[in-house]
Regions:
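Conserved SAM-binding strand-loop segment of SAM-dependent methyltransferases
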Residues: 85-96
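C-terminal substrate-binding/active-site "lid" region of AdoMet-derived donor-dependent transferases
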Residues: 115-171
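Conserved class I S-adenosyl-L-methionine
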Residues: 39-48
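A short SAM/SAH-binding and catalytic strip from SAM-dependent methyltransferases
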Residues: 105-118
């Protein structure tokens, strides 16, 4: 079976990432890899629930942690959980393409939709120098990664253009 055929057998919400939640162990690995710390303003785009921002604030002591997701039910459930746990984080119900991420220093961005990626790369390019964009499985299209611990990848603003897909993959 070809990979394309296999992918067609998977549920659309799984492929889109809509129903995928990163395990806590994975989130912690990603945060260690990115050197997330007390001076960071962390954004989890497509957060799904409060786990990522909860770990960022409680264990990595970030200055600020914000989760954004377009699924109202998931955000409301996450808000209920953080209120019960008395955690000082922010959850926003919004399309990430419309969100204000201008004060971010570290962003976790794991999307597969090409339109969303293209739109967000434009936003990312306007962020402060040294802002880290963390992706999983692949770097931002057409840019060289700054740091790789596969499957985790970091691109830093300003992005470095790749001359070819081969250069991007070999970096």
């Amino acid at each position: 079976m070809k990979i394309e055929e296999y992918l067609q057998t998977l549920p659309k919400n799984l492929l889109s990432g809509e129903d995928v939640q990163l395990p806590e162990k994975t989130l912690k690995e990603i945060f260690k890899f990115s050197n997330l710390g007390k001076n960071d303003i962390f954004f989890h785009l497509g957060c799904n629930n409060e786990k990522g921002i909860e770990i960022a604030i409680n264990e990595f002591k970030v200055k600020k942690a914000i989760g954004i997701d377009n699924n109202l039910e998931k955000i409301q459930n996450a808000q209920k959980n953080i209120k019960e746990k008395n955690i000082d984080v922010k959850l926003i119900h919004q399309n990430i393409e419309e969100s204000d991420i201008s004060d971010a220093t570290v962003i976790l961005f794991w999307f597969t939709d090409e339109k969303t990626i293209k739109s967000m790369v434009k936003k990312f390019n306007k962020l402060k120098p040294e802002t880290k964009i963390i992706t999983i499985w692949g770097p931002l299209p057409n840019y060289l990664p700054d740091k790789v611990n596969f499957p985790y990848i970091i691109n830093k603003v300003p992005f470095k253009k790749a001359e070819s897909v081969q250069e991007q993959l070999l970096s």
